[in-house]
Amino acid sequence: MNTLTAVCSRGGNIIACPHGAIGIDQEMIDYLTRPEDTAKHASLLGSMIAFDLHKEFGIPACIYDAIGTDEMQPIARVTGLPEIPRFTVGHTLNTRAMAIKCAEEVLKKPFNECTFIVAHLGGGSSIRLYHKGVNIDCVNDDEGNFSPERGGGCSGKELVKLCFKEFSEGAGEKTVMKKIHGNGGLKAHLGTTDAIEVEKRIEAGDKYAKVVYDAMAYRVAKDIGTLSVPVAGKVDRIILTGGIAYSKYLTSQIAEKVDWIAPVEMMPGEYEMEALAGGALRVLRGEEELQDFAEIKASAVDRIRICEGVEPYTVPEN
């Protein structure tokens, strides 16, 4: 290979951005590297490398389906605490890519004419509802099901008690956050994040490993059922993807609980590199627009506003 036409990277946690391609410029890099504006994530490095290649070779550079992609409908954002609205963050790149692939190869229909529930099952798991091309609702990795590393949703009252207990014993916010987001789920119960090891324990007769692992499948299935409600159960396909979707033990349990909603497609693994290449190619062909970061930042508040005249509790920095 001696010609490079464009470069496309995973996107960092740009708050409330739409799906698709966003051009990388100095303003984006400045935003992504300011700790007060965005959370630390490995994908930040990709954006910086892509921008360096853009400057060196004069080729287009973009991010695609960033982890901060948030297109949730206003009604889905409301919680009982105005200070804590709901938002979307996480596995947009792989879940949207798998939904597009399923639409094209299985249903033979345009993606924006279909409705999918896509469960990304990995170290952290999230579930997305794609309706007519838009991710209108989700279950984030800290809201519902637990996973190998995440604690998932739990009693708010008990969580408050746990936080105060940890603080009284000298722990700080980072320690408590790590307990929930990194050391929760299978790791907390079984001391490992390796699903293969857990299944071997189950085969060897470990009853506790079985009930915890089965509970993880149960919670995923419940969340899939939850996301069928906003579209009145009119779902074209349920897709199980991510690294743990290779587990027939786990996916069979999930499928048997949700296949009454829609047929279940097993699409294990991740399709992220192909998704980045496909996104860049669609931009080069003129099939998708290369969006401007400054415009996205300027309109971010409107995208996460619950109601006209009501300011979001969390306002993106301009």
Task: Please provide the spans of the model-predicted regions.
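General beta-strand structural signal in soluble alpha/beta enzymes
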Residues: 7-9, 60-66, 117-119, 137-139, ...
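Structural signal for terminal/edge beta-strands and the immediately following C-terminal loop/tail
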Residues: 266-318
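Phosphate/pyrophosphate-binding loops at sites that engage ATP/ADP/AMP, CoA/4′-phosphopantetheine
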Residues: 1-5, 105-109, 223-236
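Conserved phosphate-binding/catalytic loops in two-lobed NTP-binding clefts
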Residues: 248, 252-278
